[in-house]
Regions:
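Bacterial Sec-dependent N-terminal signal peptides
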Residues: 1-23
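Short, flexible N-terminal segments of the mature chain
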Residues: 41-59
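Short, surface-exposed ligand-recognition loops at beta-strand->loop->(often short) alpha-helix junctions
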Residues: 32-43, 82-85
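Short, intrinsically disordered low-complexity segments
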Residues: 54-94
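Short amphipathic alpha-helices in soluble, non-transmembrane regions
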Residues: 43-49, 88-99
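C-terminal partner/receptor-binding element of secreted or periplasmic proteins
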Residues: 93-132
């Protein structure tokens, strides 16, 4: 009986420390390759730099998920935590106008309110936090 209780407590502790399997993001930019790599993220970096300065935001964090394919494809998933509702709307508006112009090597696409499930990602894909 004692071993059963200890085993159940141990299993309960282990399950409490597991990573969430899916996360919902309000904004996800997918950098995809057509043949020769992914688009340059310099225009995005510049837009984020200006946005931070305009709204006096100290840090804007995103999750970089990848590699998603053989040619360096990856996702940038923005949680938009710490922004006001107005800032979120303006950020999405700026992203919507910027992303279609990012076509130098591949293509960048924007998806909103997307849930990313860890089980659906390639086995070699990792998630890292990127601060702008």
């Amino acid at each position: 009986m004692k071993q059963i209780i200890i085993s159940l407590l141990f299993l309960g502790l282990i399950s409490g420390f597991t990573q969430p399997t899916s996360v919902k993001y309000p904004v996800v930019i997918k950098f995809q390759s057509i043949c020769c790599g992914v688009p340059d993220d310099a225009p995005l970096n510049e837009m984020i730099k200006k946005f931070k300065k305009q709204y006096k935001i100290k840090t804007l964090s995103t999750t970089r998920i990848g590699p998603m394919g053989k040619e360096g494809e990856y996702y940038l998933a923005f949680s938009l935590k710490g922004m006001t509702a107005k800032q979120k709307l303006n950020f999405k508006k700026k992203i919507r106008s910027l992303v279609p112009t990012m076509k130098d090597k591949g293509v960048a696409t924007l998806e909103e309110n997307i849930t990313i499930n860890a089980a659906d990602l390639p086995s070699r894909a990792t998630s890292t936090t990127v601060n702008f």
